[in-house]
Design a protein with these regions (language model features):
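Long, low-complexity, compositionally biased intrinsically disordered regions
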Residues: 1-110
Length: 110
């Protein structure tokens, strides 16, 4: 059974993806999510996922929700860097759709 503190910790870890990304990456990631550009989402465990972003080019994504900067993407922006790009954010929103809704609600309040 998940306790309230475990649930808060889990939510805090999940929100780390959004807080680690730039505003532009969050909005573009939300757009990718809404347009269903993330394919082949595979759950490794509760905090790790892999996927493919479909666009002009296809990119492979590894998402580590517990450690956002360990997430990787083969796009030019993120390759070899510890950057949370739009593809990583889109994978996060695809894995956790409620977080996409929460992100939009939070932005409406600002």
């Amino acid at each position: 059974m998940i306790t309230d503190s475990q649930d808060q910790m889990k939510r805090g870890n999940k929100m780390g993806i959004v807080s680690s990304a730039s505003g532009a990456s969050c909005w573009r990631g939300l757009d990718y999510y809404k347009n269903k550009k993330i394919k082949n989402l595979k759950k490794i465990n509760d905090y790790e996922f892999t996927s493919t972003a479909i666009g002009t080019n296809n990119y492979d994504i590894y998402l580590d929700v517990s450690h956002p900067r360990r997430s990787t993407c083969t796009c030019p922006l993120a390759t070899g860097k510890r950057i949370v790009c739009k593809h990583i954010v889109a994978t996060f929103f695809t894995a956790f759709p409620e977080e996409a809704k929460d992100f939009e609600k939070e932005q409406e309040r600002l």
